[in-house]
Amino acid sequence: MLADEVLELLSAEISPNEYEYYIKQLKFNEKASSDETVVFNAPNELIAKFIKTKYATKIAHLFEVKTGTKPNVEITTQTKLKSSKQNQVNIKQIKAQSTLLNPAYTFENFVVGGSNEYAFLSAKAASEQPGKIYNPLFIYGPTGLGKTHLLQSVGNFCLNQGKVVICVTSEQFMTDFTYNINNHSMERFREKYRNCDVLLIDDVQFLGKTDKIQEEFFHTFNELHSKNGQIVMTSDRQPKLLKGFEDRLRTRFEWGIMADITPPELDTKIAIIQKKCEFDKIYLNKDVINYIATNMGDNIREIESAIINLNAYANLMRQEITLDFAKNVMRDLIKEKRENINLENIIEVVSKELNIKPSDIKSKSRVQNIVEARRIVIYLAKMLTTNSMPQIANYFSMKDHSAVSHNIKKINELIENNEIFNLRVSELKNKILTKG
């Protein structure tokens, strides 16, 4: 069939993940199509909107390549309902689609590592058995580490199971509440939030601002939980540290499972970058990937944004993304991070991680593990701060900058010859960038 041939052509131009998650779900609607218009059915409005925005023009072009005529391409979700049971399912899906779910966020494209494995497994279990023992699920951790990705993965999984899913930020919950209060329509508000199968609240920490919001959310939580509705929340801190919240809410947040996400290890960051490149069909060599992973800190959103900007600049300049090219394009980003880092920051992290007193690192002790820690600090200070070698030498009361060069040389030799040592230094660098 011509439509299948066109989609097969499209698969060669996009990443395998994009094809699998979006294009493969399209069904050619032969009855609704004509010579001028080609119609595809998508499983839901979210996917239809996404494909229409990103791929419709490309699909039309490929039809033109095959036939010599460029048709209009329509992506729709309209299907004939064969039974009242099917009708009920579709009504559920339509209700669920008034959410913030992004179909790009799935469990399949979430990169799992030691820093997020427990949160990942908890979210997956909550999706597979909603309203059971993982209820509520409270995922917490610093900004940009993947909490929203997991939250929306729960939503997309449950949506595909025919569940009614409501996914909002705490700000949208508050805006919705205020609007319905002012318009005397709280019955509609409660119908929406208390009769869903799955309620997802992103950044729940902001709900502690007013007593009225807390009161409403308290009753929403109770009613949903009593009906075995699944509740998943994300926050930047664990429940007992939430400010402004009543104890009765904090206690309820702890009823189910609390799962934290911590900054990713270096190998997890590398895997995340590789996954992003695979999804967006961006080629970065190993050196560039390692450079980004070790210099961009832990905020995944910032890392992904940096990759997109780097690729866009390379395309505009028609340049290959070499390590030197990446360093040049990203120099301002890296410089900004380095300006926030000083020697005290580095000593604080290194002393804590290597279990050596800061005063020992600053001393002239020749004990082997202290010497090594001091050399690591010097190496990282040259790499991560704006300090010159004479300034570093002065800080450690060394004769001149040649002593700094000697210490850096020793660390470079160890990095080149000892993979475990190299990994340890990279992890230290990673923690400093995050803290800085």
UniProtKB/Swiss-Prot annotation:
Annotated region described as Domain I, interacts with DnaA modulators, given as residue ranges: 1-69
Keywords: ATP-binding, Cytoplasm, DNA replication, DNA-binding, Lipid-binding, Nucleotide-binding
InterPro entries, alphabetized: AAA+_ATPase, Chromosome_initiator_DnaA, Chromosome_initiator_DnaA-like, Chromosome_initiator_DnaA_CS, DnaA_C, DnaA_dom, DnaA_N_dom, DnaA_N_sf
GO cellular component: cytoplasm; plasma membrane
Family that this chain belongs to: Belongs to the DnaA family.
Domain comment, as recorded: Domain I is involved in oligomerization and binding regulators, domain II is flexibile and of varying length in different bacteria, domain III forms the AAA+ region, while domain IV binds dsDNA.
NCBIfam families (UniProt xref): DnaA
Protein name: Chromosomal replication initiator protein DnaA
Species whose genome carries this gene: Campylobacter curvus (strain 525.92)
